[in-house]
Swiss-Prot record:
This is Acyl-CoA ligase easD. ATP binds at residues 213-221, 354-359, 438, 457, 555. Pathway: Antibiotic biosynthesis. Acyl-CoA ligase; part of the gene cluster that mediates the biosynthesis of emericellamides, secondary metabolites acting as antibiotics. The biosynthesis of emericellamides initiates from the highly reducing polyketide synthase easB which catalyzes the formation of the linear polyketide chain. EasB produces several polyketides that can be further processed by the downstream enzymes. The polyketides are released from easB as linear polyketide carboxylic acids, which are converted to CoA thioesters by the acyl-CoA ligase easD. Gene3D superfamilies: 3.30.300.30, 3.40.50.980, Luciferase, Domain 3.
Length: 565
């Protein structure tokens, strides 16, 4: 059975544009809004209050593209897009989207690099993407220089974005690198570039972003998201939400890195429909609460751990005037229904909505509507999205309450992975539908509409604050410690982070034998912290065993470890 969006969801009323870049689509959508809907600044800095009008944003994109064309020797209609890849390794800035769209103006591809990424991850992504140009911010200059040295990228191919001065603490000197503002000032004096010459259908094959994702196979990959994929998803989300929004514009706050698919998606949507997106460099609870009061924020785009923190610490809700908030939208991880219910009790006027999707689906596939909230579900399908639930025997689920692996069909689904033919073969089924690796089931809401519930992931991946963490990455580090002879890692529930990694270890009887288990656990925890970033840390979640439960073939029985927990 093929599941589609409920009858109440408006259909996309026109053909999805396939001959323009996604930035041009978003900006043209904004400038064509009726006067009562337009005029709002698309982006506002949460710290300084600085903003640009849509007209100024359009100019900044154009000026920046001219300057980059001169700096890099690129022309809009010459050369291959794969040879024009620009990495963006930065905390959120006001010019993030101007930079992305300037690269697209030159027929290039953006490589968003998560600011939490450690140097080896940055190097791996840039190498796979054949990226030779990078923009960074002051607090990440040291990491960027280390990555550039390893990749033999010269200093004149490193540029900087601007973080608010009030936000910076002991910033690295960056005078030797040209900034976005300098490039824009130079570009204003240069001749206008020739327009992009895209034939019909070009946006379907032209990659806009190489987005990093852990993927369903358990290894980190770069997903090729086309301009058409993003345009389609913007239209899908906007049509789904139009049922409840009634053309009303909103001021929204995003607590997500713009380099994440979720953040990228929201930014394009905000501009297209004339909303205002208040941006902070990185999430800070106090800053978010102050920002809500200062800018009268109506909608919060967050990840579940943020709502969990608010539900667990109700006093936070009374520190500032949050009366403007009407809705929250969570994504990137599942929101536990108990947390939603608790927050709903604390703030009954807030509509707590959830979105579900993958980087590979162009981000959003299902979304809760304010008129049909059902805590624990992932909401209803967007228009032009189809899902099949494939059972272990390969047949499709034939109705409600019958689980199976979620397979997607949508104009927003990605092209494939960069340089990974094996994963590409395994990612699509025999019908060409995208396999999610998630087990889901459709159930009928109290209002009578089909909602998708995600039951579990097929693989052993752990989701920490929306980030997918691979147990084997932690296991590999543990096994490199001299006092560890065997190790296995599972995910365990965590109220604030969704999940956290927990390690079961068999210790050596001859190395560090003078340490008791508590001291050795502390030593191993510090060892892991020195090798991996925060989402992989173990803290007190280390248990010592005499031996790990294993099958006859030697495979660790993680289900037994989960039963112990």
């Amino acid at each position: 059975m093929v599941f589609s969006s409920p009858s109440w969801v408006p259909r996309i009323p026109c053909e999805i544009p396939d001959s323009i870049p996604v930035g041009q689509f978003a900006l043209e959508g904004n400038t064509s809004l009726p006067p009562q809907c337009g005029g709002r600044p698309p982006f506002v800095c949460a710290i300084t209050g600085k903003s640009y009008s849509t007209k100024v944003l359009v100019d900044r994109v154009e000026f920046l593209s001219r300057s980059l064309a001169q700096e890099l020797g690129w022309s809009p209609n010459e050369g291959e897009p794969e040879d024009k890849v620009v990495g963006i390794y930065s905390w959120n800035t006001l010019d993030f989207f101007a930079l992305c769209w300037a690269v697209h103006r030159l027929n290039g591809i953006c490589l968003p690099l998560h600011p939490f990424s450690i140097v080896p991850e940055v190097v791996a992504h840039m190498k796979r993407a054949k990226c030779r140009v990078i923009f960074t911010c002051q607090s990440l200059v040291a990491n960027t220089l280390e990555a550039a040295r390893e990749l033999s990228i010269p200093g004149d191919k490193i540029y900087t974005t601007a973080l608010p001065e009030a936000y910076l603490q002991n910033p690295e000197p960056i005078d030797q690198f040209k900034s976005v503002d300098q490039l824009i000032a130079e570009g204003e004096k240069l001749q206008r570039l020739p327009p992009l010459q895209w034939e019909k259908g070009r946006a379907k094959i032209q990659v806009a972003y190489y987005c990093a994702t852990s993927g369903t196979s358990g290894k980190q990959k770069l997903a090729k998201i086309t301009h058409y994929n993003f345009i389609a998803n913007v239209m899908q989300v906007c049509m789904h939400e139009s049922y409840a929004k009634n053309g009303r514009n909103e001021i929204a706050f995003g607590a997500i890195p713009l380099t994440h698919g979720y953040g990228l998606n929201i930014g394009h949507i905000m501009v297209y429909r004339g909303d205002t997106y208040v941006i902070c460099p990185r999430f800070d609870m106090q800053l978010m609460l102050k920002t809500i009061e200062r800018f009268r924020v109506e909608r919060l785009y967050v990840v579940p751990p943020i709502l969990a923190a608010l539900a667990a610490n109700p006093f936070l809700l009374d520190l500032h005037d949050l009366s403007s908030v009407q809705a929250t939208v969570t994504g990137a991880a599942a929101l536990d229904r108990s947390i939603a219910a608790k927050l709903n009790k604390l703030r009954p006027t807030w509509k707590i909505n959830h979105a579900y999707g993958l980087t590979e689906t162009g981000v959003v596939a299902t979304l809760t509507s304010p008129h049909d909230v059902w805590h624990g579900s992932s909401g209803s399908l967007l228009p032009s999205f189809e899902i099949r639930l494939v059972k272990p025997d390969g047949t499709d689920a034939e109705g409600l309450d019958e689980p199976g692996e979620v397979h997607f069909n949508s104009p927003s689904c990605f092209l494939g992975y960069v340089g990974d033919d094996e994963s590409n073969k395994n990612t699509f089924d025999e019908k060409g539908w995208l396999k999610s690796g998630d087990i889901g089931v459709f159930r009928k809401s109290p209002n009578g509409h089909a909602h998708l519930f995600i039951l579990e992931r097929i693989k052993d991946m752990i989701k920490v604050k929306g980030e997918q963490v691979l147990p084997r990455d932690i296991e590999s580090v543990l096994l490199s410690h001299p006092a560890v002879i065997d190790a296995a890692v599972i995910g365990v529930p965590d109220e604030l982070s969704g999940e956290r990694a927990k390690a079961y270890i068999v210790r050596s009887k001859t190395v560090m034998e003078d340490l008791d288990e508590d001291d050795l656990a502390d030593e191993i925890d510090e060892f892991v912290q020195g090798k991996l970033h925060e989402s992989h840390w173990l803290h007190d979640r280390i248990v010592f065993l005499e031996k790990l439960p294993k099958s006859e073939s030697g495979k660790v029985l993680k289900k037994d470890l989960k039963a112990m927990n």
